């Protein structure tokens, strides 16, 4: 399994509309990427560090795909459409990293 890990760094003065992100952007992403091996997503709202400091990231989202090839195809075909929606929920430039799941506990 492959994950696209999208991280939104904390930036002073920036905005992030979690309601829009959860209610509009992610369902749109799911619909647009369904035919490209999209399996689901997990959203994490970063609130603090273990030591109680401010977190480095505001939000981390992991989108799961069947394969890297399908992820790449989906981004090639639908990436521009998804990116065009970013400004509706944030002005933060996301950091996207592809990861491969090599172990998982349940």
Q: Residue ranges of each PLM-predicted region?
A:
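Macromolecular interaction modules
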Residues: 1-106
């Amino acid at each position: 399994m492959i994950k696209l890990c999208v991280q939104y760094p904390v930036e002073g003065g920036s905005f992030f509309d979690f309601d829009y992100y959860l209610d509009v952007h992610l369902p749109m992403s799911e619909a647009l990427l369904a035919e490209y091996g999209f399996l689901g997503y997990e959203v994490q709202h970063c609130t603090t560090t273990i030591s109680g400091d401010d977190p480095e990231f505001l939000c981390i989202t992991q989108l799961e795909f069947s394969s890297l090839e399908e992820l790449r195809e989906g981004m090639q075909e639908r990436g521009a459409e998804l990116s065009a929606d970013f400004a509706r929920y944030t002005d933060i430039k996301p950091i996207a990293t592809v990861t491969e799941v090599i172990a998982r506990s349940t």
